[in-house]
């Protein structure tokens, strides 16, 4: 066999194997970020947020970006009065989403935490909607507390973030939210309702300390993981895994004064 034919044979084998490997990963890796399948349909979407009086200095500014995005994209927006459920405020998003779903006025509900704001108003969230998916959110690589045995290395794990949630108004999601609400063991957890969702979806590694217990379950069949553009947490690192010009910036984990300072510097209206 000539060298030319041998090279072509090797190239063909590699291309075939590479294609098989990629397909295998797509079919078996529930953490794959879905490709953007652009939808031409315009859905009835309601953007919602809620915060208490102690968060006014942040929420009163960020909500204006939600309102502006809704106006540009042709959606509805409401800043809902924080209900008195007796739980930490972060939990109330679950109660609010359930109450809004029961009304059946909108096809999709988009929750955004009050410590997040739109940075780019021109990209339609409806472009992310896929017929078989009902829950849309972002996941981030986060450093875990257990140290690595290797020098100059850190262990990271994928953690879901519920600061931005797009949910289809469906019976599946209403039942899911009720199960989240019923996870009372997480009422006072540092991640509140997010910890309950992590438990329900079998992302338990950061809840029980077992780093292998993060594989997910059948709930992921209805979940689409969006790119970090939709929920980008600022980093102090020069090289960040987050996007340089994201759609939504989420000031998760920041102190209140730092949030105000960041918003005054970065928020675009």
Each model region followed by its residue ranges:
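N-terminal anchoring/stem segment of glycosyltransferases
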Residues: 6-107, 205
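Short acidic donor-binding/metal-coordinating loop in glycosyltransferase active sites
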Residues: 82, 114-116, 121
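Catalytic core and acceptor-binding pocket of nucleotide-sugar-dependent glycosyltransferases
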Residues: 88-91, 95, 167-268
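Short beta-strand-to-loop acidic/aromatic patch adjacent to the donor-nucleotide binding site
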Residues: 106-115
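Conserved donor-nucleotide/metal-binding helix-loop-beta segment in metal-dependent transferases, i.e.
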Residues: 118-157
């Amino acid at each position: 066999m000539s060298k030319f034919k041998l090279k072509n044979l090797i190239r063909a084998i590699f291309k075939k194997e590479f294609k098989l490997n990629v397909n295998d990963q797509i079919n078996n890796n529930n953490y794959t970020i879905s490709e953007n399948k652009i939808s031409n349909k315009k859905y009835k979407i309601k953007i919602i947020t809620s915060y208490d009086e102690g968060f006014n200095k942040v929420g009163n500014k960020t909500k204006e970006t939600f309102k502006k995005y809704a106006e540009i994209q042709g959606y509805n927006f409401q800043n809902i009065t924080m209900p008195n459920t007796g739980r930490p405020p972060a939990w109330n998003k679950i109660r609010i989403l359930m109450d809004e779903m029961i009304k059946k006025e909108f096809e999709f509900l988009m929750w955004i935490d009050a410590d997040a704001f739109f940075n780019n108003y021109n990209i339609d969230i409806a472009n992310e909607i896929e017929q078989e998916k009902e829950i849309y959110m972002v996941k981030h690589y986060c450093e875990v507390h257990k140290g690595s045995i290797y020098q100059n290395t850190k262990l990271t794990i994928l953690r879901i973030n519920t600061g931005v949630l797009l949910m289809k108004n469906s019976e599946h999601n209403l039942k899911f939210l009720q199960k989240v609400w019923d996870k009372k063991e997480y009422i006072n957890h540092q991640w509140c309702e997010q910890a309950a969702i992590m438990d329900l979806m079998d992302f338990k590694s950061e809840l029980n300390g077992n780093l292998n217990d993060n594989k997910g379950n059948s709930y992921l069949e209805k979940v689409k993981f969006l790119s970090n553009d939709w929920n980008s947490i600022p980093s102090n690192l020069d090289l960040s895994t987050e996007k340089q010009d994201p759609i939504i910036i989420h000031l998760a984990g920041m102190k209140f004064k730092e949030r105000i300072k960041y918003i005054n510097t970065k928020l675009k209206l």
